[in-house]
């Protein structure tokens, strides 16, 4: 072991935290223990409860010491020994668990004071601002332009180069569209018109199905449609083993 490495190990092993208030210093060993932080074990003097202190004073000093310990730990983790492996250095230099300031820590108290002060300033600024129409942040939509393929027929009757104003043009287009919808026949507008040829073909097909849909028995139906009904039971077909009128014996217990 080199002289420099031995000196560093002795310095780290004898290091201790500075005392804060009436509480004693904590050994560096508590840093490596899983109970380091807010769950670290207290000494005999720290475990004694002072009745003169309020609970929030204990909590405030507790979180203040914790934030100091975290700051010191972040400073110490930058140190490394020459014999350390790369994995140890990486874990030591990595951020373990970055946390936000606690609810009653001095950092949180100062941030709350600053935020409340800025909020009061912004509120006073809003009150002194002259009243008017609120600025809209909605995204503007573009007007829809009809293409050649989807342009309605009634638009063709108007000349785009005419001297009619934009508003009057819109009104005339809308009224023309409404008049056309009102005077148009509901049959031609909302029903699907089939050609006579398709109607005749569908009628002939339906007649053919009705003519060939009557069979003397289930066996004849199965033979014409090439269906195997052996060992199968069909509803309301006695020849297949179905019971047309099943009976329920209510006096089964009396027998």
Curated annotation (Swiss-Prot):
Basic and acidic residues bias: start-end ranges: 1-12
**Superkingdom of the organism of origin:** Eukaryota
Polar residues compositional bias, start-end = 13-30
List the biased-composition ranges (Basic residues).
131-142
* Record-listed Phosphoserine modification sites: 217
- Which keywords annotate this record? Phosphoprotein
Provide the protein name: Increased copper sensitivity protein 2
Organism equals Saccharomyces cerevisiae (strain ATCC 204508 / S288c) (Baker's yeast)
